[in-house]
Amino acid sequence: MPSATSHSGSGSKSSGPPPPSGSSGSEAAAGAGAAAPASQHPATGTGAVQTEAMKQILGVIDKKLRNLEKKKGKLDDYQERMNKGERLNQDQLDAVSKYQEVTNNLEFAKELQRSFMALSQDIQKTIKKTARREQLMREEAEQKRLKTVLELQYVLDKLGDDEVRTDLKQGLNGVPILSEEELSLLDEFYKLVDPERDMSLRLNEQYEHASIHLWDLLEGKEKPVCGTTYKVLKEIVERVFQSNYFDSTHNHQNGLCEEEEAASAPAVEDQVPEAEPEPAEEYTEQSEVESTEYVNRQFMAETQFTSGEKEQVDEWTVETVEVVNSLQQQPQAASPSVPEPHSLTPVAQADPLVRRQRVQDLMAQMQGPYNFIQDSMLDFENQTLDPAIVSAQPMNPTQNMDMPQLVCPPVHSESRLAQPNQVPVQPEATQVPLVSSTSEGYTASQPLYQPSHATEQRPQKEPIDQIQATISLNTDQTTASSSLPAASQPQVFQAGTSKPLHSSGINVNAAPFQSMQTVFNMNAPVPPVNEPETLKQQNQYQASYNQSFSSQPHQVEQTELQQEQLQTVVGTYHGSPDQSHQVTGNHQQPPQQNTGFPRSNQPYYNSRGVSRGGSRGARGLMNGYRGPANGFRGGYDGYRPSFSNTPNSGYTQSQFSAPRDYSGYQRDGYQQNFKRGSGQSGPRGAPRGRGGPPRPNRGMPQMNTQQVN
């Protein structure tokens, strides 16, 4: 049973009895005999006939192969039935006995089919190669004929020249090439191939007759023409071609042109050295352009770049004048015939002080305005930083006059050139945020940032219970401030340089500020206060803020300053109108406190986020309520700035140079302590807080206040 199934073919089974094995073998032999002459057919027939014949042979073999597969499948069925025990008739038993012969014929037919398919592929390749070869030969013959036609036309045209005719009759080395009769035959044939225009015939018909004459000449036919035959004319033309007469003969007109060109060549060469520019001029011009254009595009500021091109050239090519002059003198020494270089632009020598000032100005511009320094770049050393306490003292008169260049107002920008030894700072970058407002509105003025080279450490010896909030401007500060060219008279604060400032946005470590003294300090302690005292003093705050500044754009001299009273608020503390507080900045931190404020249970954070460097409780107090330091733009009479919890604080409220909108000042259950004052000068007209009696601030510890005389 397994042997019967193993020999089963893939062909379909037929219902009728299988044909005898002898007939199948004869059919295969006939197919092989028919293929034998077909294999010799490609050598005698065309490509198309060979391809068609091969397709027919492959079709016959494929048909016989399908019949053998059907027969083999039928025999497999008979053998399977016999193995199951079924009884078969005699014809079926005879067919089963021929099973091996049918299998052999099937294998032979398959092998024959593979052979003919390979032969067919070879024939196809041969046909393609032959067709390609014939195409190339045909193109080559056509190209050769076309070349011969062009040569014949050229020879016939040149025979009209008397000199050419004489040369052909005399020949080369005394051997004549053509005789007079042959020249006459060529003249007659020329009239046939290049006839004159006959208006009685169409142009197409006239040149059709001429092409027939040329074709017969190229073929060398024996047809008579001009008293001779095309074959004789072809021999005459070939003799002229083989003489190579026209290869060595030059046209006289072309020769004259060549002689004229050769004669004009030396004249051009003589003019070239005269028109050569001097290398010295080109070199100096390139050096000047490269140095000027590179520096102006890379390092010049935008305002100075558009001010004037002549000023930029004088500014940045001053240092390279000596090099350009040396390069100029070398070509002059080598070629004394040139009196002066025309491409060198003379540059005037600038003042050394002005030049040094411009270099320092460039250094400051490359450093960049410190208003754009991010908060993440600032380094904080104090962990209890809190801008809530204002501590101010007048600066020394000697320190106020150290760097007068930095206190010039922006309207006098040309005064930067007055002090060449100082590093100037851009006007928009020297503004320290200060608040200078009145009871009726907000008035912005240009503050003065007065640096100091010496670091002054203030002692902490006074008792802690004396918190003073009055800025006393003494006579020394009045004398120093009146001598400075300023647009307005602001408050001047001083602190140690080791305490960097956070909310001012100034990087004191930058190059323009390394020689200055930082004027802020965040180390003033504040003791806590009791809540009842705070509730008693909430409604006793001053109704107006008496600090005022002059906004004159010109320099004024003030011999005496009024002593202004700065009244500050910590948490819900409000001073009465008759209270006068003075902050001396000499406080002593109590031993029972590690920081200025204890950690509160519910600190308030505004939408800006916490500042870096402080504890969590202290950071919540930095911007926990609305005031001029955290973006409030309303009337100043209802709010007071906050105190700082760090010792020796010299920080005051920020100026509204860029107003900020903090929308989260009423979040996390925070309720403002009081309504806005009557004087509304900010962009918001209606208060956002609730009315009614004020409540103590939930996110801040209370401070004890003490009135001093």
UniProtKB/Swiss-Prot annotation:
Give the Low complexity compositional bias ranges. 1-15, 22-43, 477-491, 537-570, 676-686, 697-709
Provide the residue span(s) of the region labelled G3BP1-binding: 360-381
Q: Supply the InterPro entries for this chain.
A: Caprin (IPR028816), Caprin-1_C (IPR022070), Caprin-1_dimer (IPR041637)
Query: What is known about the tissue distribution of this protein?
Result: Ubiquitous.
Q: Where is this chain's protein located in or outside the cell?
A: Cytoplasm, Cytoplasmic ribonucleoprotein granule; Cytoplasm, Cytosol; Cell projection, Dendrite; Cell projection, Lamellipodium
Domain of life where this protein originates = Eukaryota
Phosphoserine: modified positions: 10, 115, 335, 343
Keyword RNA-binding part of the UniProt annotation:
yes
- Residue numbers spanned by region Disordered: 1-50, 260-291, 417-446, 475-499, 524-709
Q: What is its main location?
A: cytoplasm
Q: Which GO terms describe its cellular component?
A: cell leading edge; cytoplasm; cytoplasmic stress granule; cytosol; dendrite; intracellular membraneless organelle; lamellipodium; membrane
For this chain, the Swiss-Prot or TrEMBL PTM comment says: Tyrosine phosphorylation by EPHA4 promotes interaction with FMR1 and liquid-liquid phase separation (LLPS) for the formation of a membraneless compartment that concentrates mRNAs with associated regulatory factors. O-glycosylated (O-GlcNAcylated), in a cell cycle-dependent manner. O-glycosylation by OGT inhibit ability to undergo liquid-liquid phase separation (LLPS).
Name of the protein in question: Caprin-1
Q: Lineage of the source organism? A: Eukaryota, Metazoa, Chordata, Craniata, Vertebrata
| Name of the gene encoding the protein in the UniProt record | CAPRIN1
